[in-house]
Curated annotation (Swiss-Prot):
PANTHER family in UniProt: 4-NITROPHENYLPHOSPHATASE-RELATED, PHOSPHATIDYLGLYCEROPHOSPHATASE GEP4, MITOCHONDRIAL
Top-level taxon of the source organism: Eukaryota
GO biological process, one term: root development
Pfam entry (one): PGP_phosphatase
Family note: Belongs to the HAD-like hydrolase superfamily.
Protein name: Phosphatidylglycerophosphate phosphatase 1, chloroplastic/mitochondrial
Molecular function as annotated in GO: phosphatidylglycerophosphatase activity
Polar residues biased stretches: 55-67
Organism of origin: Arabidopsis thaliana
Alphabetically ordered keywords of this record: Chloroplast, Hydrolase, Lipid biosynthesis, Lipid metabolism, Mitochondrion, Phospholipid biosynthesis, Phospholipid metabolism, Plastid, Transit peptide
Length: 348
């Protein structure tokens, strides 16, 4: 599991400026565009009489050259931007202009449709970014940890601690009256950021499925959390890989109630088992809501982010200190002797 409890994919979208859209054309002109005026840019002078002298002809020719004006940048720009208002009545954002004495309308291209697609992409990117940060910065965990350290230290202590899932006797737990099992994901079932069950744990997981049937689920801050797994893609991918239901929830552990979990299993939380590797998240959440809590060792510390490793060290240091001082875990109504459901794996 990747959320530290005591501490904290990809381009941004910006609307395209309209001035950028009105830059001068640099590609060949569209032959379908209508010119802005039926008047010629320059009109040739009336033909001279046959009696004109060569000097007059030369003077007239020079005058024509002076009066002749080639299309300037402004002309090209207007020719490119203007169109007849009767050709496309659906356009908006038209700006009336004047050219050679005739009214014309400046057409600004619409970009709203493209913007919608870009905005959706930007929203998905932002959700993914929040998910990545949320797995490292657990605000709910920080607030809960302060409360635990100050007044609820017994919530950090699990009912039982084991090396991994292979040491749990699922048959005994079923006989004791437990109706379902809730697993954390990262470093409990899988390596961090992995979808595959840790290979040595597969026989134990299959045994748990055989004993509890469909009454097992994953309750994780890295998959199924509505705020960060906005389209359920992470939850669905994990379900397809491990064959275990991933619970959708709105609040990160250790905050929140067990209402969503109880609704899924159809029983009270006191009849459920919470298995996880983090004392200040999985165990605090389980004890606070009445689960039987089982703490496992992390499967792979090497693949954890640096901040998670440091927070984990602090959590375990506090846990060991409080145990040395004689602090006891909260009582559970279905179990009096926790050693009954701990076994030594046969394959070790």
């Amino acid at each position: 599991m990747q959320t530290p409890s005591m501490a904290a994919s990809t381009t941004s979208y910006y609307p395209i400026p309209k001035s950028f859209l009105l830059s001068p054309p640099r590609h060949k002109r569209n032959p379908n565009l209508i010119s802005c005026s039926t008047k010629p840019i320059c009109s040739p002078p009336p033909p001279s009489s046959s009696s004109s002298s060569p000097l007059q002809t030369t003077t007239t020719h020079r005058s024509q050259k002076q009066n002749l004006r080639l299309p300037t940048f402004e002309d090209s720009f207007l020719l490119y931007q203007f169109s007849s208002p009767t050709e496309d009545p659906g356009f908006s954002n038209r700006i009336p202009e004047q050219f050679d004495g005739e009214p014309r309308e400046l057409v600004l291209p619409r970009v709203e449709d493209n913007n919608k697609g870009l905005a959706i992409s930007s929203n998905m990117w932002w959700a993914d970014l929040k998910a990545a940060l949320g797995q490292r910065i657990n605000i709910e965990g920080i607030v809960s940890s302060v409360s635990v350290v100050v007044k609820d230290r017994q919530f950090v202590l699990p009912h039982v601690s084991v090396k991994d899932l292979r040491y749990i006797d699922w048959e005994v737990l079923k006989r004791k009256g437990f109706k379902g099992v809730v697993f954390d994901k990262d470093n409990t079932l899988t390596a961090p950021y992995s979808l595959a069950i840790w290979p040595p744990l597969r026989p134990s997981i299959e045994r748990c499925k055989a004993v509890f049937g469909h009454d097992i689920a994953v309750f994780s801050n890295s998959a199924g959390l509505t705020e960060y797994d906005h389209d359920d893609s992470k939850a669905k991918a994990l379900e397809a890989e491990i064959g275990i239901r991933v619970l959708r929830h709105r609040v990160k552990k250790p905050a929140g109630t067990a209402e969503e979990v109880e609704k899924h299993f159809g029983c009270t939380s006191s009849e459920l088992i919470m298995v996880g590797d983090r004392p200040f998240t999985d165990i605090v959440y389980g004890n606070r809501n009445g689960f039987l809590t089982v703490l496992t060792e992390p499967l792979s510390r090497a693949e954890e982010p640096f901040i998670v490793r440091q927070v984990r060290r602090l959590e375990l240091a506090l846990l060991k200190r409080w145990l040395r001082k004689g602090l006891k875990p909260v009582d559970h109504s279905l179990v009096s002797d926790i050693t009954q459901f701990v076994k030594v794996p046969s394959d070790l």
